């Protein structure tokens, strides 16, 4: 496998040039923010179009998403567009795309994608979706309905701290509601992952007394927006952006724990979060310091370590970045510092990730996920190809 990174800036364009096909199976990952695309439009440039044209009429999988910041890991954050190109010798690539408009629900969209990707040698699915309008838990459930044993690595696209609109990209055009997936096939593929959080409880456990899907109507019999306003105080004027610094830990009816981040507040005081919260679940708010988050970034990187050449994908979140402030670059450095020097990488702050924890795929919000990939020249044993996750 050959991995290459490229960047596009409003001043200077592509450095190095847009990666082009060479006949091998490939995956092209591209991350950027809305401001970058706006700047490109103002000067008559079309960097996403450049990529699309370069890889048109090939079988490559092109996956793009908007962010709350992006970097290659060896330069400044928010450089523009960041591209990580993976070229394979024996690994196969399959692609599929849909939208909520076409499918009706996120779960149906997940099923539709999975049906398009299904193959006997499918080893992992990469998927990107709107981080505002898509229920990540439902999308993961739909994928699992068809592909219960296939790990999924997913991105919920971001929009900085604005929470207004996001985009995804399949090589054709950037769209608000497209859900795009790539399947990687073949026994030569090796994937390691590390997922860690670093948040600590603040306040007591509380009971979800009314909810439906990813909408929480009542906690302890009261609208949950009031709870966030109490904890945020003067910061409640921008409740969604600042509420991302107070993720909700959810202990569901099966005693599984997950993190959910605030996405929207409705006029009746109910809240929309990044994934499902069951009625009857026990929840509590969490907070963290920059030091906490940096320590767990290093732990995630160590869990994803592999001793052979690989590419790395680092997925953090807008809430973590808001806590870290000017130290956001340090989070990526901490994660990549645990990997072999010079590992080609793409790092992005998003609205959450879909991660397979060994039992199921679900939203891991306000966590950092580090994924390393390589193509082996010999078939791995089961223990060599397993995923690694740290809590």
Please identify what each model-predicted range represents.
Residues 1-338, 343, 348-391:
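Small-residue-enriched flexible segments
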